[in-house]
Regions:
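Active-site PLP attachment segment
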Residues: 236-271
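Conserved core of the PLP fold type I
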Residues: 66-212, 223-243, 249
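Hydrophobic pocket-lining residues within nucleotide cofactor-binding pockets
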Residues: 45, 152, 254
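Generic enzyme active-site microenvironment
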Residues: 217
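Short, well-ordered beta-to-alpha junction loops that form the rim of enzyme active sites
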Residues: 42-43, 184, 220-221
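N-terminal small-domain helix-loop-helix segment of the aminotransferase-like
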Residues: 2, 11-107
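Catalytic-core helical/loop segments in enzymes performing group transfer/polymerization on anionic/lipid-linked
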Residues: 3-5, 165, 238, 266
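Short catalytic/ligand-binding loop motif for oxyanion handling, primarily in non-cytosolic enzymes
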Residues: 46-51, 187-190, 224-226, 258-261
Length: 271
């Protein structure tokens, strides 16, 4: 098989630790019973009976759309205008006052992949937290890109100093930065940056952007599972303070929000 693939990529077998732990959880359930084992690897919403939740409001609405309407092509490769407008309103509401564009993608991972492929050239470096979804690193590897990791935590707080230091080193080497933040509800820790942490983060990015273009990718896959839905998007008001050499890409996914994991419906909101 390797004879048919790219030569200049990492051909190491992909080992997903989540699936291996999930398999161990399933085996433990057989031995100890489901009441004695908590499988915390499931990235999906399940009910108290252990069944996958498919929100009735979502799928009743989806099923009411005529088949021909669902089957036909979108009006443009970047998605239908009504979809793109709906995504922007859902993601940003009235919090962001910046010029923006929305690109439809195959799930939130499609938005992440698009950014990694389009922002960085081969051989350049992606900045990631040391605790993160493993597919970020995989996507970089498939584009022949490197990764540098910042320490996500300083005690029980976001480690801004490590983030800035890592980004500065990358900026000095390649003249631009693409850094990923998975917030709110970071996977796998569940951590959400505070309002003050976001203010300091944007201020630091603005300073770094004086040396070259800075792109921040905010993966919001779990945003609608935040503790307070009324305020969980308030941090986005800080986006209004970005400098002219800063771009923010918000990776939106309907998978978690609308319990539509297999629908592969997402978007990149570019600010």
């Amino acid at each position: 098989m390797i004879n048919f693939t790219k030569k200049n990529i990492d051909h190491s077998p992909i080992r997903d630790s989540v699936f291996s732990v999930a398999a161990k959880a399933a085996e433990a359930i057989k031995i100890y019973g489901k009441d004695n084992v908590v499988n915390a690897t499931i990235g999906s919403l399940y009910n108290e009976e252990g069944e996958l939740v498919a929100l009735k409001t979502v799928f009743d609405t989806y099923n009411s759309i005529p088949a021909v309407e669902k089957a036909k092509y979108a009006q443009s490769f970047n998605g239908n205008d009504n979809f793109r407008k709906a995504v922007y309103n859902w993601v940003c509401g009235d919090k962001v006052k910046l010029r923006h564009d929305v690109i439809a993608t195959p799930g939130g991972s499609g938005a992440v992949s698009l950014a990694i492929a389009d922002i960085l050239d081969e051989g350049e470096t992606l900045v990631l937290p040391d605790i993160a979804w493993g597919s970020y690193k995989l996507m970089a590897s498939m584009n022949n890109e490197n990764c540098r990791f910042y320490s996500m935590f300083d005690g029980d707080k976001f480690n801004l100093e490590s983030f800035v230091s890592t980004c500065r080193q990358v900026m000095e080497k390649q003249g631009k930065v693409l850094a990923i933040i998975n917030d709110p509800c970071h996977n796998p820790t569940g951590y959400s940056l505070t309002e003050e942490e976001w203010k300091k983060l944007i201020a630091a990015i603005n300073r770094l952007s004086k040396k070259g273009p800075f792109v921040l990718l905010d993966d919001i896959a779990y945003i609608d599972y935040s503790y307070n839905l009324d305020t969980c998007r308030n941090y986005m008001t800080n986006f209004n303070d970005i400098g002219e050499n800063v771009m923010i890409i918000v990776a939106f996914s309907s998978s978690k929000t609308l319990t539509s994991y297999g629908l592969r419906c997402g978007a990149a909101v570019v600010l």
